[in-house]
A protein has these predicted regions:
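Solvent-exposed, well-ordered loop and adjacent helix/strand elements within mature globular domains
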Residues: 21-142
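Sec-dependent signal peptide recognition
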Residues: 3-11
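Hydrophobic h-region of N-terminal signal peptides that target proteins for export
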Residues: 12-21
Length: 142
């Protein structure tokens, strides 16, 4: 009887792990979301360039072609720059920027300056895709 119980528990564990592996989200958490504009007063000296070097095109931001978020630094361990996340109620965004270190457990959605800024608490976000790992070329000449 003990062997049967152990076998059932092992099978249940495998089923649960396979179900979570098969889901599309790699990491899920609840955060505060805010919005920002690509202007000097809300960014650094180069507001049209993100932390990973992506150039912001305000026309694409306004039309929704370029959907970028900045992420608080405490979340970078699980959601690295270049990742694709799903923000519940808002859609898919690329993580291209980082926030000031004083902010914790927060994401900042880039939006055009013509839209009204907002803040929402306890919004679910899901990591959908991590960026590809860049391999170092060992045969590169110096």
């Amino acid at each position: 009887m003990k062997k049967l119980k152990r076998y059932i528990l092992i099978c249940l564990g495998l089923i649960l792990s396979l179900q979570s592996y098969g889901s599309k989200s790699l990491f899920t958490t609840h955060v505060t979301i805010t919005t920002y504009n690509a202007v000097r007063s809300q960014c650094d000296r180069s507001p049209l360039i993100t932390a990973d070097g992506t150039k912001i095109d305000n026309r694409k931001v306004k039309s929704g072609e370029q959907k970028i978020v900045a992420i608080s630094r405490d979340l970078l361990y699980a959601i690295p720059l270049g990742s694709l996340i799903y923000v519940e109620g808002h859609g898919y965004y690329e993580v291209r920027d980082t926030m000031n270190s004083r902010f914790k457990h927060r994401i900042d959605i880039l939006q055009h300056s013509s839209k009204k800024n907002f803040k929402k608490n306890n919004i679910k976000i899901k990591l959908v895709k991590k960026p590809p790992i860049k391999k170092k070329n060992k045969n590169r000449k110096k």
